[in-house]
Amino acid sequence: MNMTVRTIKTDAQTYSPAQQEQAQKCNVPIYLYPGAYAQRHGEIEEYRASRQANIACRDAIDAAIREHFRDNVLSKKAVQSVIGQYGFDRTMYVLAVTVLDKDGDGRISQSNRNWAKMQPIFADPDDRGNERNRAFVVRAHPGLTDLFLREVRHEKAASLEKKMPQMKKQKSEMER
């Protein structure tokens, strides 16, 4: 038995079925298009998997805010825990949908509202005209959600700055 198979079996024994399912949701690609588009193009399974991962991410954001907001301070651990589990892309997608849903809420900063409007979010109405994206709108207090998003955007910018020297180095090596 090689090391990879042994590791997979060990992981399967270590984690509960719920934890294994959660880990799988983290690796699901984001499906940007509405359910009707997915249905027409035979991509309904991808749509559903992405939707479930979005809901799980929303729950993780709510839990992180609840667990890491103390004494009027949102700990950086809140953002790090969600980003570590779901990555920047899904976390930012769920937050963009949340901000767009709360567009008239003054507790969301103008900066975050402008950012959300620039994200590729498609309306996803059901047969009754209700927006399906609301299923993964963050439920935490809008002011705390705004703080969380501000920190996510800051962390994303910092991670891009860290990658910049590496990218420049790779580019110069390619030009040689």
Write out the residue ranges for each language-model feature.
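Gram-negative host-targeted secretion-system effectors, predominantly Type III and Type IV
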Residues: 1-175
